[in-house]
Structure formats: C-alpha cells, structure tokens
C-alpha cells in the first residue's frame, strides 16, 4: 500500500471509529510479528476499537474496499495467523471486559480480550471455574476460542471451544450476529477454532463448573515408554481424573540421552486425607511415585507459578502440535526420539507434552481429530535460535507430514505450513463445507488472509 493510500485509510478510519486508529511506525512494528517470530507482515493501520460497533464499522469499510483485516488478541499464534500485510489489524485486547459471572447459570460472559487469568480470578471468587484451562493463563479468551483451547482437563471436558455456549460475531461483511448451536449454527461452529477466518468474536458466553475445595496431585515417574503410554490411556479411559498432565523429557545418560516420562494425576476432593492412593493408582505401571501434593483448588486453577513469557531477541517458536490416533502414539513418539536432536528442544529443558482423551469429548468441525475412539494431543515445542531455525522448521514440517500420514490432525494455532493438498487432508470430508461457510460469511476473503488456502 502506498503512502498516499495509507494516509487515506488512516483518515477514513479515524472518521468512522471512536477508538484509537494509528499508523505510528513503532506501533506497526509491534504488530508485524506474532509469538512464533517467524512470519513478518507489516500492517498499514492498527485499530483499537472502543466496542463492537467500532469492529462493525471497520469490517464494513474493509469489505467495501477489499482491504484485509486481521483480528489479534495477545498474538500467541506462530504462523502469522493474526498478522496482515498492508491491511488493518484490529487489536481486540482492548475489548477486555468481563461482563458477568453467573453462578446460577454456571457461565460467564466476556469480551474477547479478557485474559483467562482474569476470568479464573473472577470466577473462583464465587466458587466456580472454567471446565478447561490451557497451560498458559495469559492467553485471551477470544484467542483460545479462535484456536482450540486444549488443556490438562480436556480428557474429561473437551476443548474450551466445546464449552462455549454463545457468541457475538462480526462477519466478513460487517454483520453483527448473535449465534449459538441453534441460532446461526454454521457461523458459531466455524468461528470456534476457525482462526479468525469466518468472523470476529466481540462477546463470548462460556460454561463454568463448581469444583471441590482441594486438589491432590500424584506425580508418577516412568522409565518405560510403553508403560507411560498405557497408563495415559487407562487414566483417560477409566479413572476419571479431573486433570492429566503428561510430559516426556530428555535426560542425560553418560554420553547418550534417554527419555523419561512424568504423569501428574489431579483429583479434586473435599478431604485429601480421605483419598485412597492405592485405589486411584491401582493397575498403573509407574516406576516411582515421586510426590503427592495437596493444595487449594483455587490456587491450582490460578496457575500463578507460570510466568508470562515474551520471546527474547533471536528466539523463534515453530511448535508442532498434532492430534494422533492412539494406535500410532507410541510408534510416533519413538520416531521423535530418534529424529529430534536434544538441542532442537532446548536440551534437557525441552518437553514433549501428551494429553490423552477419548474421541467423543470434542465435536467441532474446525477442530479436526482422528477417528479412533482414543487419541492424544502431542505437543513438541522447540525454541530455535536463528542459525538453527531452518533446520528446526524443516524437522517440524517432516513431523507434521508424518502425523498426517498416520491419521493425525494438526492444531491450527501453532506452526502450520500447509499447501492446499495438506489442507484438504487436514479437513477431509469437511473441506467442501468449510469452503461454503467461508464464501457465505467472508465472500471477499478479507479476514485473516494468507493462512488457510481455500478453494478459488
């Protein structure tokens, strides 16, 4: 976009909206990258809307002139999903209000820029909590609803998007729509997990649940991968734990490197002293019970021990996160152990996360998962320095392709570098429907362009 065109865009938007409109170079620079730090796109203008009406005005203007618009919360995407090249960035973090905590309805209503840490603080004050929290409390509610929102409790409750009751959405034509599973269900079901491709959320209604006052965590250690995989399945399938947090980590072993596993089994209770560890852990094949930890559930949910992370200069994050059919989990992990060098994951500090779940816990068209009754979300999260970035990216792409080949499906909020054949494989028989919904609600393709390669 030329300087004259940018000036005209800036002038027009300042007349249209009541929020802030800026093209200050230092502001544009902050919005030119996301958390992944790999993709760079330079916006022409950043808009910080005052309310949903401002979002409507911006999108209607952009639709009439075919100007791209990207919606952005905390910018935690890794493939440029929240970036735009010479278009408009809508900074939704400024729409951060929590409108209501409704104990009787067991729900909360908020704007998209509210942080999950803020929601947890407000809801636990009334003895309620969201069913699922991701491992990072500083993500925005709108951001995880656009991506997926998977966490340690997903084996019981599904993704965060499975627990959304209703949305207010601005479509790609600038229409403000109230939607849920009964009203405009196509819009509702595709905006959730849709990475901003079908509409922009301006208000979210989400479930809450009541919780017991204490959490007990059993921390189990494993040396044998087969036992680690089998116990994850058993816990997700039969034990009904409130949360399962499983990790694999490289450990030095002389000149070699071996992998060890840890499973944290989290159980809510009225009285930790009344819990029978032998009953909860019977039939499992761990090598050691490393520790048993009791704490208030409100503190456990607050995740206050997790620091807020900003990328350091020269750091890049091409994370590969995929849902795998359970029958392929152990062979895939064994392949990762042989192909992923220790340095690619940050040495012994690097983790592979495994989240076991039944297939039935999620039923969302934009959250594609394998067909088997049991599955696992596998998260490989390297931190790469610039000299090693091309090698790490190539490795993550190979692992991504390997996961698709065995029936896996990718999490779209992370490093996803697909051509159209891969997009068709990702969505399978849902691909034609997804294209129809895109054409209906964003006919000019102005919303977050450049990520999903839709049919022409």
Model-predicted segments: where are they?
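Glycine-rich N-terminal segment of FAD-binding domains in flavoprotein oxidoreductases
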Residues: 25-132, 148
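Short, hydrophobic/aliphatic alpha-helical segments
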Residues: 54-67, 121-135, 175-191, 393-400
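Short, acidic, Ser/Thr-enriched surface-loop or helix-capping motifs
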Residues: 103, 140, 171-172
């Amino acid at each position: 976009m030329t300087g004259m065109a940018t000036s005209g865009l800036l002038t027009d938007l300042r007349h249209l909206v009541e929020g802030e409109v800026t093209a200050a170079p230092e502001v544009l620079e902050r919005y030119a990258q996301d958390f992944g730090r790999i993709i760079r796109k330079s916006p022409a203008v950043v808009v910080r809307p005052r309310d949903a009406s401002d979002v409507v005005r911006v999108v209607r203007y952009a639709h009439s002139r075919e100007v791209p618009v990207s919606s952005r919360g905390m910018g935690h995407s890794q493939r440029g999903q929240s970036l735009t090249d010479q278009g408009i960035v809508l900074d939704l973090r400024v729409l951060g209000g929590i409108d209501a905590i409704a104990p009787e309805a067991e729900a909360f209503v908020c704007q998209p820029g509210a942080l999950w840490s803020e929601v947890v603080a407000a809801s636990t004050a009334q003895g309620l909590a969201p069913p699922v929290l991701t491992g990072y409390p500083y993500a925005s509610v709108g951001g995880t609803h656009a991506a997926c929102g998977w966490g340690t409790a997903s084996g019981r409750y599904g993704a965060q998007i499975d627990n959304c009751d209703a949305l207010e959405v601005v479509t790609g034509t600038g229409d403000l729509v109230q939607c849920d599973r009964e009203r405009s269900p196509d819009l509702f079901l595709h905006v959730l997990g849709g990475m901003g491709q079908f509409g922009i959320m301006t208000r979210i209604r989400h479930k809450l649940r009541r919780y017991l006052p204490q959490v007990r965590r059993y921390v189990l250690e494993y040396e044998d991968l087969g036992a680690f995989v089998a116990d994850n399945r058993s816990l997700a399938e039969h034990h009904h734990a409130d949360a399962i947090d499983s990790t694999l980590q490289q450990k030095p072993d002389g000149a070699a490197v071996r992998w060890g596993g840890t499973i944290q089994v989290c159980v809510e209770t009225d009285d930790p002293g009344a819990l029978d560890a032998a009953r909860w852990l019977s039939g499992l094949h761990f090598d050691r019970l490393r520790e048993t930890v009791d704490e208030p559930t409100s503190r456990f949910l607050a995740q206050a021990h997790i620091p807020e992370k900003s990328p350091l200069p020269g750091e890049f994050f091409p994370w590969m996160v995929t849902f795998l059919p359970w029958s392929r989990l152990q062979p895939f992990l064994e392949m990762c152990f042989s192909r992923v060098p220790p340095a690619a994951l940050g040495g012994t500090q690097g983790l592979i996360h495994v989240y076991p779940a039944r297939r039935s816990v999620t039923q969302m068209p934009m959250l594609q998962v394998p067909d088997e009754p049991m599955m696992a979300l596998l998260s490989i999260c390297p931190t790469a320095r610039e000299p090693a970035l091309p090698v790490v990216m190539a490795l993550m792409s190979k692992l991504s392709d390997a996961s698709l080949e065995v029936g896996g499906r990718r999490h779209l909020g992370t490093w996803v570098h697909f051509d159209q054949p891969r997009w068709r494989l990702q969505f399978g028989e849902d691909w034609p429907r997804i294209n129809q919904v895109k054409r209906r609600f964003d006919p000019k393709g102005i919303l977050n362009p450049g990520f999903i390669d839709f049919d022409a």
